[in-house]
């Protein structure tokens, strides 16, 4: 596709370029299974007329805006919805709609470091999102990287060991509610208990929960542990464009109002501002508000259940075929052996790490899509990659432990 910028391009040529681009996107959408994006938002076309305006939610969502071209009322409605979901009263929380999960993480650690525990050490598992380590570098925080269990969950013994060694320093802790690659969920209650066992008082630690992917799944699943502000956590961030679905990248950050104590009053925008960004997208609050209003708790619960069931369905199919595979409880991320062919990986938009690949089962990924992927995978495995009896699938014992199905499986036990 020719998309270089030329002077005075005709409308006909522009339309031709965009039409070709749209056709490519529509075709590739069928194969987008490796990254957590919900593309089921055709109904958002209803909101297209808004694009004739510029909407900017600059500054604090809860303060007056100097112009009419904003969507702060919608933003506050979305924030109130999440505050209720995460069990914190309206007058006790503060938050805003971010550009994505990364900004939410940056804001959470900014609060933990700048406002509360300036000498605190940051504790994060090695399977945490890269933005956690970016925050440590940006804020020049002392980072304690914690080992992980084979399923990607934080290693609680290693955490305890490092907490005890650094007991003279406050702790700022990242909790993963769905790690980037394995979809692992850290046990918040166990981490809190570990802090208490190590002698940390409530005012000597700050917990940020990175719920980028699973934040809208766990609340609607029976027997899943609650992540709530009724527990001693400081902030929660979530991605809006992942499980919920939004055409533009966005996220939600919620914290305790008492933590946002030194807001900067900016005369130019007539607003206090404790956000990371200056100008903020005024469209994303409306898209999120619209989607939450259309779906409600019932549809979100159904989406959550369906995705978990479909993830188990894919796991079972791979397992029956003798393929190394792992799926965490309450997760929609299916980890399996990395395909040999880069073209296959590219065709199905798979995310890969070392000898592993994963599929993230989002709303819109149907069993028909899963069956199509599985059929394609088996065709490649049986007639191309491993047709030669000497060619063997990789051993994933180091990454998947007993979930590895390679020829050396007996040696793993």
UniProtKB/Swiss-Prot annotation:
The protein's required cofactors: pyridoxal 5'-phosphate
Tissue expression: Ripe fruits; not detected in leaves and unripe fruit.
Residues reported in the UniProt entry to bind substrate: 129
UniProt EC number: 4.1.1.22
First-tier enzyme category under EC: lyase
GO terms, molecular function: histidine decarboxylase activity; pyridoxal phosphate binding
Known catalytic reactions: L-histidine + H(+) = histamine + CO2
GO BP field: carboxylic acid metabolic process
InterPro entries: Group_II_Decarboxylase, PyrdxlP-dep_de-COase, PyrdxlP-dep_Trfase, PyrdxlP-dep_Trfase_major, PyrdxlP-dep_Trfase_small, Pyridoxal-P_BS
Positions where N6-(pyridoxal phosphate)lysine occurs in the chain: 242
Keywords of this entry: Decarboxylase, Lyase, Pyridoxal phosphate
Protein family per UniProt: Belongs to the group II decarboxylase family.
NCBIfam families assigned: PRK02769.1
Protein name: Histidine decarboxylase
Lineage: Eukaryota, Viridiplantae, Streptophyta, Embryophyta, Tracheophyta
């Amino acid at each position: 596709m020719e998309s270089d910028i030329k002077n005075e391009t005709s409308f006909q040529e522009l339309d031709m370029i965009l039409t070709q681009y749209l056709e490519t996107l529509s075709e590739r959408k069928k194969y987008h299974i490796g990254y957590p994006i919900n593309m089921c938002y055709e109904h958002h076309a209803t909101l297209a007329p808004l694009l004739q305006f510029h909407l900017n939610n600059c500054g604090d969502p809860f303060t007056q805006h100097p112009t009419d071209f904003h969507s702060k009322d919608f933003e506050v409605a979305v924030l109130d919805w999440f505050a209720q979901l995460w069990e914190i009263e309206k007058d006790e929380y503060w938050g805003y709609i971010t550009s994505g999960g990364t900004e939410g993480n940056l804001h959470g650690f900014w609060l933990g470091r700048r406002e509360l525990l300036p000498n605190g050490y940051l504790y994060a598992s090695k399977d945490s999102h890269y933005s956690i380590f970016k925050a440590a570098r940006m804020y020049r925080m002392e980072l304690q990287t914690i080992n992980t269990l084979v399923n990607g969950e934080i290693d609680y013994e290693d955490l305890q060991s490092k907490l005890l060694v650094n007991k003279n320093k406050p702790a700022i802790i990242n909790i993963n509610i769905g790690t980037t690659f394995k979809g692992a969920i850290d046990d918040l209650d166990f981490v809190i208990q570990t802090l208490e066992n190590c002698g940390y008082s409530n005012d000597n630690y700050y917990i940020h929960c990175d719920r980028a992917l699973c934040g809208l799944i766990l609340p609607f699943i029976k027997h899943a542990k609650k992540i709530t502000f009724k527990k001693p956590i400081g902030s929660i961030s979530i991605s809006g464009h992942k499980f919920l679905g939004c055409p533009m990248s966005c996220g939600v950050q919620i914290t305790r109002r008492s933590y946002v104590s030194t807001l900067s009053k900016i005369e130019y925008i007539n607003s206090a501002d404790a956000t990371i960004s200056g100008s903020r997208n005024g469209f994303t609050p409306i898209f999120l508000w619209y989607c939450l209003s259309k779906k409600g708790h019932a549809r979100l619960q159904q989406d959550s259940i369906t995705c978990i069931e479909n993830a188990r369905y894919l796991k079972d199919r791979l397992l029956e075929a003798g393929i190394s595979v792992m799926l965490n409880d309450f997760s929609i991320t299916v980890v399996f052996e990395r395909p040999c062919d880069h073209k296959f990986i590219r065709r199905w938009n798979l995310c890969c790490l070392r000898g592993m690949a994963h599929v993230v089962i989002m709303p819109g990924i149907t069993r028909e899509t899963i069956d199509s992927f599985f059929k394609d995978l088996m065709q490649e495995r049986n007639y191309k990659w491993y047709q030669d009896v000497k060619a063997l699938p990789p051993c994933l014992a180091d990454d998947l432990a007993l979930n590895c199905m390679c020829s050396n499986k007996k040696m793993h036990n």
